[in-house]
UniProtKB/Swiss-Prot annotation:
Encoding gene, per UniProt annotation: fabR
InterPro entries (alphabetical): DesT_TetR_C, Homeodomain-like_sf, HTH_TetR, HTH_transcr_repressor_FabR, Tscrpt_reg_HTH_FabR
DNA-binding region(s), chain positions: 33-52
GO terms, biological process: fatty acid biosynthetic process; negative regulation of fatty acid biosynthetic process
Location(s), subcellular: Cytoplasm
Residues of the HTH tetR-type domain: 10-70
Designated name of the protein: HTH-type transcriptional repressor FabR
Subunit structure: Homodimer.
Keyword entries, A-Z: Cytoplasm, DNA-binding, Fatty acid biosynthesis, Fatty acid metabolism, Lipid biosynthesis, Lipid metabolism, Repressor, Transcription, Transcription regulation
Segments forming a coiled coil: none
Reported function: Represses the transcription of fabB, involved in unsaturated fatty acid (UFA) biosynthesis. By controlling UFA production, FabR directly influences the physical properties of the membrane bilayer.
Length: 215
């Protein structure tokens, strides 16, 4: 990558970070203006268009980055789990760390999931579907259940996780700890329920797999 290309990528990165920094519990992406973002990034408003067609393209890039960031962290958590440790507790702790370190990224996903822009809703839906698919892959590999079961389990887990994440955004340390404990319990209940439901179905044909991986 040449010097000019590197500088362009650096400025593009500055615009994304500037937009994230202006989000808050009181301020959504829809309220941001091109001028504000450009000023925060230290460039002229007209220079914005060298990097993004419009503010919406910037927002869609932010959605993609938020989803990717979360998925990468969860992959790292699964790698740690492979070395020993609780599957669910490690995953929940990693998720809560993500919210604590990147609250505006998670806020963006939550808000745009049900926002007024069809393009943003579709982008968030894709990111959530990627998240569900990766979790279903992991569950299928670890628990040896059919894809239909692991997808249903993964979807239920992700739904509960995102709901807990929304609660965790603006609470204190102790309340977040309590939320984390509740979430661990709920996910364990889903995990055990999914396995025993599958085992009941398999008992009809006397095909019972090994027990589900203990969390």
């Amino acid at each position: 990558m040449g010097v000019r290309a590197q500088q362009k990528e650096k400025t593009r990165r500055s615009l994304v970070e500037a937009a994230f920094s202006q989000l808050s519990a009181e301020r959504s992406f829809a309220s941001l203006s091109l001028r504000e973002v450009a000023r925060e990034a230290g460039i002229a408003p007209t220079s914005f268009y060298r990097h993004f067609r419009d503010v919406d393209e910037l927002g869609l890039t932010m959605v993609d980055e938020s989803g990717l960031m979360l998925r990468q962290l969860m992959r790292q958590a699964r790698q740690r789990i492979a070395k020993g440790g609780s599957v669910i507790r490690t995953s929940v702790s990693t998720f809560m760390e993500f919210i604590g370190n990147n609250p505006n990224a998670f806020r963006l996903l939550l808000r745009e999931r049900s926002g007024t822009s069809a393009a943003f809703r579709a982008a968030v839906a894709r990111e959530i579907q990627h998240f569900i698919a990766e979790l279903a892959d992991y569950l299928e590999l670890e628990n040896h259940m059919p894809r239909a079961f692991t997808e249903a389990q993964a979807e239920a887990m992700v739904t509960i996780v995102f709901s807990a994440g929304a609660e965790a955004l603006d609470v204190g340390v102790e309340q977040r700890r309590q939320l984390e404990e509740r979430l661990v319990l709920q996910l364990r209940m889903i995990s055990k329920g999914a396995y025993y439901w599958y085992r009941r179905e398999q008992e009809k044909t006397a095909i019972i797999p090994g027990n589900v991986k203990d969390e």
